[in-house]
């Protein structure tokens, strides 16, 4: 099947108008077109600068594995496999073969990872199971089992011809009315009032309402036409195909992955396809100083063979499959694949209205293509993410990723660790430090162990806070654990912990209609008078939790929003979107994150310490909970808000950056015990406080999450209120599951069962040092949420009993 056979309209005229224009004709663009058409939207034009599949699709390896660490991506890949199975029965089949996949462990640590993955596969109903060495050999007879500890087999994984897949989806889209125009180069994207309005090509201009950038390795270049930065880098990715030698009448072998040796195999006709992830990565047409500059004529082309970088992969392949040493090589593929800084897709609407992106497939785009097309079509037609897509949402990449150096260094680090075992609380090391708190030097001098989040250096804990090792968790949870966290936790519960939260995002909303705008955006009543602070959610149209933050009224028409470190770009993007789409153009939204430091002081002695530094009255009567006012410390006027994220008396202090470092030192000298973010995590988990992106996201509503107290009883016209009114009787609820053994710490994604039936999965977990328990959050069917209900949770293949606690 060729492009011309699919299109049969090579010389057709470009339309002057379409509702949606898709740029890019690889598996991403054709999947978006296919799914839009399947959902009834056929006023769609797809354009490609060359032939369909001429970018990265044609040289993809075509392996389809479904299980991923992210639950949403797993669901997307499951849709892909289901779709490819269905397309195989169509008039334009994509050569889908459901051969199954084997993953082997060449180390005991990898076998632990496999057993953990088998556990979370149960929560999706996927048939992933451990297999013996004998069965590994039966399913992949060429393997040398030396050093293999064990393995697992996924029955419904498979492989597909990438080009035929794209053409199959293109054919399906065309049948429903989508127009496809190849050899049509995009020159300009026009905007009006912050929204796309037209796509200018070398064949003419198409007026449109929506543009979807599926440009593959060219996606960043296309985005620059509207001044949007997409942090992707084309990376050299290599594999080879051997000469034919297998019996053409034998069943196709399962694919094989040996991550400890960085390699993968699948059958290609009667030969083998073998590739891997080199420890020495190489970017293409990108440097630390410049953006990508891909040649205009790079179509249906490959890069030069780089055997020096591939040498380790080749040697490992011959060790694992000795036959490789005897086989001739039919072709060696070195093709550029677009990677992102965290090895996840880059999807969604950008800061330019109705300009969407679906790019950065990180060499697993064939497995994800079907799911990408589905969620993007739903996102476009529904005007918001259809499920929890945060880990793939372009809004997760903040201003730091406008830096070519930061983006490239992080992408190379992650590429080289692609097949590593990733333990909890693992930290990336590239391009650090990038952003720091005003008190950074003090923290460094006092033995702070830093972590990084959204390019900010943050204190995890202080190494000189040495405690007992007796509570070190079992297994993986203990890998990056520190006894310092327990000391800092106790210091906060019993005295006063001081926390540098300067990385928290601060958004200022102002204007004559700022109050009206925020009352529309937020589910809670946020306008309670100057000096009042409110905890609230912002909901999507389905009643799901889009944002979770506090709002403080600074003046009649000026408000300060405090949200998580990683959510500045996301939350600001949501506010800008609602402002643009609902007629609040006169409202200003400004990011003040780098202008203000935030220090938290919490614990029973916090008032005593803070009162010693200010003449302002901090008594309960003068300074109630959720109130905010200016106070003076050391001759500096700062804002103090009585609020807590750890369940103790305390304040957050908002301080101009230039004045912040001396105030931190005063808090310390006055008796504050310096603590890090890992103590915050333990403290808030113990008190049942929630984190967006952890326990709450767009897939859950406030009633399910136990946040009904943060929903207004007075108004019914806030965004998402209509949907929320029908969700007051949830069928599932968020619960805490407690384990009496504090060292039995859940990591997340573990299956939960009752009476041998899987009923859910763990969302997050940790240690509660005050209660001396291990604690987890999970959403469970309502009949299992009664406090005291006993449940089993699987840890690395072994079931342990916990029970539902009172929240």
Q: Could you say what each language-model-derived stretch is?
A:
Residues 1-20, 38-42:
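Extreme N-terminal leader/targeting segments of oxidoreductases
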Residues 2, 83-86, 106-182, 188-195, ...:
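Flavin (FAD/FMN) cofactor-binding and adjacent substrate-gating region
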Residues 31, 65, 189-304, 312-323, ...:
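Flavin-dependent oxidoreductases
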Residues 37-57:
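Glycine-rich FAD pyrophosphate-binding loop
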Residues 62-139, 260-265, 269-273, 283, ...:
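Dinucleotide-binding Rossmann-like beta1-alpha1 core, especially the glycine-rich loop
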Residues 63, 69, 157-159, 262-264, ...:
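Glycine-rich phosphate/pyrophosphate-binding beta-alpha loops
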Residues 269, 301-421, 427-431:
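C-terminal catalytic lobe of FAD-dependent flavoproteins
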Residues 387-388, 394-807:
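Glycine/proline-enriched, intrinsically flexible loops and inter-domain linkers
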């Amino acid at each position: 099947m060729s492009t011309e056979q699919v299109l049969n309209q090579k010389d057709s005229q470009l339309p002057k108008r379409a509702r949606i224009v898709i740029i890019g004709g690889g598996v991403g663009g054709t999947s978006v077109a296919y799914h839009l058409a399947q959902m009834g939207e056929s006023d769609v034009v797809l354009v490609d600068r060359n032939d369909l599949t001429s970018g990265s699709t044609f040289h993809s390896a075509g392996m389809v594995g479904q299980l991923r660490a992210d639950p949403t991506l797993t669901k997307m890949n499951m849709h892909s496999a289901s779709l490819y199975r269905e397309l195989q029965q169509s008039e334009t089949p994509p050569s889908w073969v459901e051969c199954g996949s084997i993953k082997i462990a060449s180390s005991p640590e990898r076998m632990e990872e496999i057993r953990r993955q088998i556990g979370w596969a149960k929560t999706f109903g996927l048939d992933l199971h451990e297999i013996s060495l004998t069965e590994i050999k039966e399913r992949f007879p060429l393997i040398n089992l030396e050093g293999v500890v064990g393995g697992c087999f996924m029955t419904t994984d498979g492989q597909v011809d990438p080009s035929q897949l794209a053409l199959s989806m293109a054919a399906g889209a065309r049948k429903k009315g989508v127009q496809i125009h190849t050899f049509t180069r995009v020159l300009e994207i026009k905007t009006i009032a912050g929204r796309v309005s037209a796509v200018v090509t070398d064949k003419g201009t198409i007026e449109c309402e929506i543009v979807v950038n599926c440009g593959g390795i060219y996606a960043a270049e296309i985005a620059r036409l509207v001044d949007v930065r997409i942090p992707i880098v084309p990376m050299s990715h290599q594999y080879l195909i051997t000469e034919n030698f297998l019996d053409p009448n034998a069943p196709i072998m399962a694919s094989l992955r040996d991550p400890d040796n960085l390699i993968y195999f699948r059958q290609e006709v009667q030969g083998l396809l073998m590739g891997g992830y080199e420890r020495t990565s190489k970017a293409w047409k990108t440097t630390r100083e410049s953006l990508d500059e891909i040649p205009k004529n790079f179509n249906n082309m490959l890069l030069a063979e780089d055997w020096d970088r591939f040498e380790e992969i080749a040697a490992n392949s011959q060790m694992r499959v000795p036959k490789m040493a005897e086989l001739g090589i039919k072709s060696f593929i070195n093709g550029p694949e677009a990677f992102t800084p965290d090895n996840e897709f880059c999807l969604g609407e950008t800061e330019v209205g109705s300009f969407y992106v679906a790019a950065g497939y990180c060499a697993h785009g064939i497995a994800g293509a079907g799911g990408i097309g589905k969620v993007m079509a739903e996102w476009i037609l529904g005007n918001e993410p259809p499920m929890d897509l945060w880990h793939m949402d372009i809004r997760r990449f903040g201003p730091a990723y406008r830096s070519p150096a930061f983006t490239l260094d992080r992408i190379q680090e992650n590429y080289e660790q692609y097949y590593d075992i990733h333990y909890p609380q693992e930290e990336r090391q590239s391009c650090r430090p990038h952003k720091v708190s005003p008190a950074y030097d003090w923290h460094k001098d006092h033995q702070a162990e830093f972590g990084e989040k959204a390019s900010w250096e943050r204190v995890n804990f202080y190494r000189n806070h040495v405690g007992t090792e007796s509570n070190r968790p079992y297994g993986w949870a203990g890998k990056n654990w520190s006894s310092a966290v327990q000391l800092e936790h106790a210091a906060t519960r019993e005295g006063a912990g001081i926390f540098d939260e300067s990385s928290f995002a601060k958004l200022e909303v102002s204007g004559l209609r700022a109050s009206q705008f925020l009352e529309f955006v937020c589910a809670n009543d946020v306008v309670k008078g100057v000096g009042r602070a409110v905890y609230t959610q912002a909901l999507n149209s389905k009643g799901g939790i889009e944002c979770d933050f506090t709002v403080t009224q600074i003046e009649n028409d000026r408000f300060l929003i405090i949200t998580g470190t990683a959510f500045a770009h996301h939350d600001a993007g949501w506010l800008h979107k609602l402002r643009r789409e609902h007629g609040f153009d006169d409202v200003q939204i400004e990011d003040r994150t780098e202008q203000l430091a935030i220090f938290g002081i919490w614990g029973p002695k916090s008032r005593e310490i803070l009162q010693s530094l200010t003449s302002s009255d901090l008594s309960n009567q003068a300074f109630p909970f959720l109130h905010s006012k200016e106070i003076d410390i050391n001759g500096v006027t700062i804002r103090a808000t009585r609020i807590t994220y750890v369940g103790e008396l305390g304040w957050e202090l908002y301080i101009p950056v230039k004045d912040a470092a001396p105030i931190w030192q005063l808090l310390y000298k006055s008796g504050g015990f310096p603590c890090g973010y890992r103590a915050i995590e333990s403290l808030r988990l113990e008190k049942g406080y929630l984190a967006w992106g952890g326990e709450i996201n767009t897939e859950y509503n406030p009633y399910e999450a136990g946040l009904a107290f943060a929903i207004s009883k007075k108004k019914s016209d806030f965004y998402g209120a209509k949907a929320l009114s029908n969700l007051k009787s949830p069928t599932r609820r968020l619960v805490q599951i407690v384990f009496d053994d504090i060292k039995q710490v859940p990591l997340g994604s573990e299956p939960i069962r009752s009476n041998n039936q899987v009923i859910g999965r763990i969302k997050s977990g940790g240690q509660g040092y005050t209660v001396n328990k291990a604690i987890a959050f999970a959403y469970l069917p309502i009949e299992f949420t009664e406090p005291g209900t006993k449940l089993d949770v699987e840890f690395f293949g072994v079931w342990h009993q916990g029970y539902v606690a009172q929240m």
